[in-house]
């Protein structure tokens, strides 16, 4: 019962709990439903209300983000007042901002005015400084002019001799003839120009006996000679050709003497006559041996009893009469060592009597001791050297065929000329054994051997010190040949082996120069004969001709603009502005010193003694103190001699030579716009004398083309043909020594040009410029290549932007082999390479590169020829052809470039640099 009751109670209790749970669940569900109803009904209404209120607030300029309390609604009016205040402040801020911007604009304008004023002040200071420099320079020039005590020299004015002269009979003994007693100086004033009258051999009996080739070659060279005149009355010198005679004709000395005495201008004594006997064969007769005239004799064979030192002339034989050597047939000078160390071919003529010997008097035969005959010792020694096999030599003392006719005791030539030349091309040295007769000073056979050795680059070794080599009065034969006494024949082998390659090549190169200049053609022989006599009587050479410029009329007046690419050189000017007219370099200051004091250098270095130049880059330089102690005319030392940094440096040229200017030579071809831009860039360039524009186009400039006014004359020169050689013609309008050759599309800053000019003044004999190139060895093909890649070595400076001396323009146009200029015209290329070859050949120095420029870029310029691939192939060919013409590679390498002295040097605040960017 109790258990039942408990169960029941428990059941009743559990049921109550269940009912309570159900009731609470219903309440929760009802509350949740009510809550959801409230949210779903009232929230959209509230949101709609506030959204509509927000729109109204926005329209009133208010932003309402939610419901406000009752107290806040009272403050709406205050908020509106604050908003109005904010709007007012914003308007004031906008007005203040506008005023601030106006003030900033005014400040910027004022700053610009300040900068302009500062710039104008600086310009005024620069102008003042330049004016002070000009005043100083003018005062200096005035003082120099007032203190000048030496007349200004120029091209000599010709003073001609009178028609009649008193005559000058020779001394009783014709062997005593010398210039002082057998030459009439009154007919040859120093400024006479050395007029020469040449007899026409066809008008005289002896002319019919002359060798036709000799006569024809002689007449051709006479027609082209600048000294020859047809007016015998004003002549200083009279020339008559008497040989070589045709075989077998032999004119007796008495007959020839009689014919010479009957010459129309002989004037009873024949003073100032030169009798020329040119040789073509080794057995040429000594036609003038017993002809007693007492006058100059020029021939290739002389006996001691006949030759008068300082009066007669030993000349080269006339081997061939071509106008210019065929450079393709001449072997190269390198390699230095050839197959044979030395060679000799010849056969001794044993006969001691001949028609020539019989003509000698008995007293002459008996004079002195009998000659020592070294020929047997020479033969034995040379054969021993050949048999020793120490060096490969070739000596033959018997001709395979009949030897050439020769004089007694002389070594006759063997074989034909072509065969002898082929052997000499394989020979490092060529032995020349002088005749055994000590009275025979020189013979045609020896002179022919010398000619052939020099022609092919075999260094002559002359055994016999008594020999008188051609033109020995002026030529320093020790630079091109070895003259060894015959008693030293046993030491010849040792002597030849001891020569270094550099010495040997220097002798070979000098021998080539002597052969080309004095031996190779009929022109060179005749010019040398006249030059020898002219030098002896101290008359200067004829002035070298200048190219007369045909000016193209053009309109100028266009104001030159300023180039934004021009570098500012800081507070330094680049030189004084020249207010006086452009001044030319002085000319012909050394008319007579070149002939008197410097004649040996002129005779033994290119181009020889045949021209008088207005100036050369080799003129002597005064010591530094001379400019302050009486020889200061024309000098402008820096700081008056005290030196200085940038400002003092830019105020004067300084250096080791007098003040000077330079001429710009600009080659152009149908690029008018590019040309005008380039000319404008030259505006205001200090020390610029003139601009010569070489108009290379057949079309004239446009008639409406207005040329810029750059402060100096612009001369537009018309050329006869389109040739790159025109760039280097020595135009008469170029009045300065310094030439800046520049392409019409080259961009150079003023400071770069001025620095290049200053460097050139210290290296006047070299090319000084900007773009560098070099020659590279092509190993597979064993030839040369033109290379424009960046390199630490260079050997050329392109003349599209380079300084050089006008002297080289003369050499390029009138002295350099014509074959080189012809190739330049053929390819329309390589003229810059040719100029580098020429200068290095003359000086044996490389060019000088200035600044870091390697090339030039011309944006907007028409395509240049240098961009074509064939351009480089042609330049390869040019280099190798030029090497053949010169016989060797004259270009030399250099491994440095030049910058200004104080470049990248830390300076005190009171010092300035020479150039800002260089």
Swiss-Prot record:
Its EC number is 2.4.1.223. Residues 52-918 are lumenal. GO terms for biological process: heparan sulfate proteoglycan biosynthetic process; negative regulation of cytokine production involved in inflammatory response; negative regulation of inflammatory response; negative regulation of inflammatory response to wounding; negative regulation of keratinocyte differentiation; positive regulation of detection of glucose; positive regulation of keratinocyte proliferation; positive regulation of phosphatidylinositol 3-kinase/protein kinase B signal transduction. The gene is Extl3. This is Exostosin-like 3. Mn(2+) binds at residue 745. It is a single-pass type II membrane protein. It comes from the Eukaryota. InterPro entries: Exostosin, Exostosin_GT47, GT64_dom, Nucleotide-diphossugar_trans. Disruption phenotype: Embryonically lethal at 9 days post-coitum (dpc). Embryos are defective in heparan sulfate (HS) synthesis. Conditional knockout in pancreatic islet beta-cells results in a lack of HS in pancreatic islet beta-cells. Abnormal pancreatic islet morphology with reduced beta-cell proliferation and glucose intolerance due to defective insulin secretion. Disulfide bonds join 177-182, 188-236, 399-414, 830-878. It holds the Pfam family Exostosin_GT47. Belongs to the glycosyltransferase 47 family. UDP-N-acetyl-alpha-D-glucosamine binds at residues 667, 671, 696, 722, 727, 743-745, 831-832, 875. Residues 1-30 are cytoplasmic. Its main location: endoplasmic reticulum. Glycans are attached at residues 290, 591, 789. Homodimer; disulfide-linked. Interacts with REG3A. Gene3D superfamilies: Spore Coat Polysaccharide Biosynthesis Protein SpsA, Chain A (3.90.550.10). Residues 1-140 are annotated as: Required for interaction with REG3A.
